[in-house]
């Protein structure tokens, strides 16, 4: 998997996790499906890190969580850690979820400032 390539592709990241990586100008969008838990945390971390590296400031890294059936705390921690790293180089990490519980969890964990949650990919891309 090479998220620096132009276009969009789907890759089975693990048995429980699938992801589509899409380039939108200099932004990168991850569409995650399935489950993220301790069993595939390192795979998730590798995917997020590579996608972040392929994102060019000032465009964002957008992570669409709408296709997830389960997201463990470890997945949120990976996103928060990468958001802090991205912020240092001028890249925002923006989440997409229609599930209000996701925003509540992000805020309860204290990550609301670094992981804003948007209702659509389009709104995440256009946010300032």
Curated annotation (Swiss-Prot):
Q: What CDD domains has UniProt attached to this entry?
A: STAS_anti-anti-sigma_factors
> Biological process GO terms, please?
regulation of DNA-templated transcription
Q: Which Cys pairs are S-S linked?
A: 73-109
Q: What is the effect of changing residue 73 to A/S?
A: Constitutive interaction with RsbW; leads to active SigF
Q: Which residues form the STAS domain?
A: 17-128
A single GO molecular function term of this UniProt record: anti-sigma factor antagonist activity
Which terms are listed as keywords in the entry?
Answer: Disulfide bond, Transcription, Transcription regulation
Q: Which domain of life is it from?
A: Bacteria
For this protein, the record's InterPro entries field holds: Anti-sigma_ant, STAS_dom, STAS_dom_sf
Keyword Ion transport: yes or no?
A: no
Q: Does the keyword Disulfide bond apply?
A: yes
Q: What does this protein do?
A: Positive, redox-sensitive regulator of sigma-F (SigF) activity. When reduced binds to anti-sigma-F factor RsbW (UsfX) preventing its binding to SigF, thus activating transcription.
State how it assembles.
Answer: Monomer. Interacts with anti-sigma-F factor RsbW (UsfX) under reducing conditions, with a possible 2:1 RbsW:RsfA stoichiometry.
Its family remark reads: Belongs to the anti-sigma-factor antagonist family.
Q: What is this protein called?
A: Anti-sigma-F factor antagonist RsfA
Query: Which organism is this entry from?
Result: Mycobacterium tuberculosis (strain ATCC 25618 / H37Rv)
Organism ancestry: Bacteria, Bacillati, Actinomycetota, Actinomycetes, Mycobacteriales
């Amino acid at each position: 998997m090479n998220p620096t390539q132009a276009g969009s592709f789907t890759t089975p990241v693990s048995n429980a996790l699938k992801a589509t990586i899409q380039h939108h100008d200099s932004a990168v969008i991850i569409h995650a499906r399935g489950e993220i838990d301790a069993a595939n945390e390192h795979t998730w971390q590798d995917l997020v890190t590579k996608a972040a590296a392929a994102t060019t400031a000032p465009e964002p890294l957008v992570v669409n969580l709408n296709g997830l059936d389960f997201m463990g705390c470890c997945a949120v921690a990976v996103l928060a850690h990468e958001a802090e790293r991205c912020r240092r180089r001028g890249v925002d990490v923006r989440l997409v979820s229609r599930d209000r519980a996701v925003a509540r969890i992000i805020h309860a964990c204290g990550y609301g400032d670094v992981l804003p949650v948007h209702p659509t990919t389009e709104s995440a891309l256009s946010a300032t």
